[in-house]
């Protein structure tokens, strides 16, 4: 939890209360009774793991080494069209943003993925010079995801078979973007 003031009790901040409740519910874990194919609803607390996979793949290391699955995907669809991701390090609504990039430029807010379309790689000046790409106006982080049209409860109610993914434990995706892991604090 990051905050500019401590006027709100810690337990009421962010998702602390919900996560602590889930931890008590997970004392006696139960395996899924059978293998199934279904839908995944990824909660905001879990989403950062998956965002890290994407942003790591569009940053200097993977773009310079040409191992990114997104290296030739600028202005192309890479996610569901309902997904929009912004990096807003200088937004007044972000308490743990930043004003200067790692390579010394003034940071700006931007949109990384717009309605599923990759709009930028997160290249530093070094990465841009090495690849001929464009230097990003920020280094990512301070993420804001646009809200969908339906509340979480309605989404869950309309799923016949699936999982509400609250925590994920797994390795980095393979070179082709596939991943595997364990669902934790999930229902």
Regions found by a protein language model. Give the residues of each.
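Extended amphipathic alpha-helical scaffolds
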Residues: 1-11, 43, 55, 64-86
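Conserved active-site and cofactor/substrate-binding residues in soluble primary-metabolism enzymes
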Residues: 11-18, 35, 45, 49, ...
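Dual-mode signal for accessory low-complexity, basic/Gly-rich regions
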Residues: 73-187
């Amino acid at each position: 939890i990051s905050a500019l003031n401590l006027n709100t009790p810690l337990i009421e901040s962010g998702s602390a209360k919900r996560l602590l409740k889930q931890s008590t519910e997970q004392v006696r874990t139960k395996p899924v009774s059978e293998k199934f194919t279904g839908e995944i609803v990824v909660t905001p607390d879990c989403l950062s793991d998956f965002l890290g996979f994407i942003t790591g793949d569009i940053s200097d290391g993977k773009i310079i080494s040409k191992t990114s699955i997104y290296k030739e995907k600028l202005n192309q669809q890479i996610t569901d069209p309902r997904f929009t991701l912004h990096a807003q390090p200088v937004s007044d609504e972000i308490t743990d943003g930043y004003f200067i990039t790692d390579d010394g430029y003034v940071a700006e807010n931007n949109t990384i993925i717009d309605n599923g379309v990759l709009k930028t790689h997160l290249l530093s000046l070094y990465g841009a010079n090495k690849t001929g790409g464009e230097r990003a106006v920020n280094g990512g982080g301070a993420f804001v995801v646009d809200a969908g049209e339906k509340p979480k409860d309605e989404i869950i109610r309309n799923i016949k078979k699936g999982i509400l993914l609250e925590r994920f434990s797994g390795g980095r995706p393979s070179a082709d973007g596939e991943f595997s892991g364990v669902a934790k604090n999930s229902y």
